[in-house]
Curated annotation (Swiss-Prot):
It comes from the Eukaryota. GO terms for molecular function: G protein-coupled receptor activity; olfactory receptor activity. The keyword Disulfide bond applies. This is Olfactory receptor 10J5. The keyword Ligase does not apply. Coiled coil: none annotated.
Length: 309
């Protein structure tokens, strides 16, 4: 069968929040504020964990890795979005779009599997406390972090290779960054294979972590219920609630965004979901999981007190 000739597309333009009209300046101020808070909070967490030896444990090692990943994650998406809110119709090259999607997929996948590693850490700490330091060795922690990044890299190569081998007819991306489905819609040809790849990858990235975390917490809850002291049960359970909150928000938004049927898709809902998992969730992590943590707050007080004195 003879291949059709397609006009070569060299750049895209984001439609973004153009439908919000006069509210775009308000959105810019809100998103900029959240962006700055996210960067500051995550940088504070990474810095405190690095310089305070009391926090040199597997749990806080994973926290620092998640905070670092979330920082880069926001840097990949938000600055370009803020630029588009002020200067409309700012183009992005095909290579720039591919690069943004590549790092977005790496970091989003990495975050999911880091949360899984943190769930395993909680399982070992609560269910196998006497062997915790032996099991959660530096070597295993490094392997879990490298494994998370490696899975993210593999998924990104799969996605970007499949996506940018497509011929594109349209140039206007009905979104605020190079997300998978909005870019796929611009293709001139049938994208069934790409949709199958996306569904398979998304299912793996979402359901494998959820499944492993679920198993971990079934075992954790059974151990918590065996604790004799009510105060002990409450304290142990509190350490798990923050992690579960982040997992539910992160994986919940991702599953709705990437696994919902086409018939249920709408531009407004997709924008709200995307804002949640690209802008709100990276701020939620440090607030819920770290800055409310007593050990982190104590470490912050020690660092501030040391600098003042």
């Amino acid at each position: 069968m003879k291949r059709k000739n397609f006009t070569e597309v060299s750049e895209f333009i984001f439609l973004g929040f153009s439908s919000f009209g006069k509210h775009q300046i308000t959105l810019f101020v809100v998103f900029l504020t959240v962006y700055i808070l996210t960067l500051v909070a995550n940088i504070i967490i990474v810095t405190i964990i690095c310089i305070d030896h009391h926090l040199h444990t597997p749990m806080y090692f994973f926290l620092s890795m998640l905070a670092s990943s979330e920082t880069v994650y926001t840097l990949v998406i938000v600055p370009r979005m803020l630029l588009s809110l002020i200067f409309h119709n700012q183009p992005i090259s095909l290579a720039g779009c591919a690069t943004q999607m590549f790092f977005f997929v790496i970091l989003a996948t990495n975050n999911c599997f880091l949360l899984t590693a943190m769930g395993y850490d909680r399982y070992v700490a609560i269910c196998r406390p006497l062997r915790y330091t032996v099991i959660m060795s530096k070597g295993l922690c490094a392997q879990l972090v490298c494994g998370s990044f490696g899975i993210g890299l593999t998924m990104a190569v799969l996605h970007v290779t499949a996506m940018f081998n497509l011929p594109f007819c349209g140039t206007v991306v009905d979104h605020f960054f190079c997300d998978i489905y909005p870019v796929m819609k611009l293709s001139c040809i049938d994208t069934t294979i790409n949709e199958i790849i996306n569904y398979g990858v998304s299912s793996f990235v979402i359901f494998v972590p959820i499944g492993l975390i679920f198993i971990s917490y079934v075992l954790v809850i059974s151990s918590i219920l065996q604790i004799a002291s009510a105060e002990g049960r409450k304290k142990t359970f509190a350490t798990c609630v923050s992690h579960l909150t982040v997992v539910i928000v992160h994986c919940g938004c991702a599953s709705i965004a990437y696994l919902k049927p086409k018939s249920e898709s709408s531009i407004e809902k997709d924008l709200v979901l995307s804002v949640t998992y690209t802008i709100i969730t990276p701020l939620l992590n440090p607030v819920v999981y770290s800055l409310r943590n007593k050990e982190v707050k104590d470490a912050l007080c020690r660092v501030v007190g040391r600098n003042i004195s």
